[in-house]
């Protein structure tokens, strides 16, 4: 199985502890969620339900095949087609989502990083949090905005062509925006190029 560049060499991303466009994952963790690791990928089916935070609540998936990808679950089971399948090898970035893990040192107590959903096995989400492109608008509206600033910038600057790769670019841009907003910094052109290197148009 191929290995995605971003999911292995990208520096950890941090979501802001202030008013954020991410769902309130720390609160959901407090309702019985653990930091447990997923079952072995060689076990056939996961013996206990997989639990992870999605859209501010704990999602539970029972009887999941250990070889099922997060992308397949999103598109086929959760009916969330916003996350696209491009290369299915972890190279094009069309399927980019953000996966969060508890981290007391991170703003808000959760550390998010970019992940290629096409090579992320579903059981690996156990005890974590998930943020997809379709989760951005409701969270933005809760903060009094129509879209996340990354989405709004793409609209205003005509940043899409056919649009198929756009959701992946958006999620990478969200990670950059939230990371730098929390740090009070602004990325330079070269930093942005590095951050978006895993997304192909």
Task: Give the ranges of each region predicted by the language model.
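Low-complexity, intrinsically disordered Ser/Thr/Pro- and acidic-rich segments
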Residues: 1-3
């Amino acid at each position: 199985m191929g290995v995605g560049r971003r999911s292995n060499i990208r520096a950890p991303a941090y979501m802001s502890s202030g008013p954020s466009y991410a769902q309130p994952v720390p609160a959901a963790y407090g309702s019985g969620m653990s930091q447990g690791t997923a079952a072995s990928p060689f076990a056939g089916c996961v013996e206990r339900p997989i639990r992870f935070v999605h859209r501010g609540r704990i999602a539970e998936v029972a009887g999941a095949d250990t070889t099922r990808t997060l992308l397949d679950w999103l598109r086929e089971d959760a009916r969330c087609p916003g996350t696209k399948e491009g290369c299915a090898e972890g190279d094009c970035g069309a399927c980019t989502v953000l996966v969060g893990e508890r981290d007391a040192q991170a703003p808000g107590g959760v550390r998010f990083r970019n992940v290629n959903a096409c090579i992320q096995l579903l059981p690996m989400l156990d005890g974590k949090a998930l943020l997809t492109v379709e989760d951005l608008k409701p969270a933005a509206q809760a903060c009094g905005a129509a879209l996340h600033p990354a989405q709004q910038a793409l609209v205003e600057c005509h940043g899409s062509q056919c649009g198929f790769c756009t959701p992946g670019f958006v999620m990478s841009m969200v990670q950059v925006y939230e990371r730098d907003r929390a740090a009070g910094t602004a990325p330079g052109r070269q930093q942005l190029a590095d951050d978006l290197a895993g997304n192909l148009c």
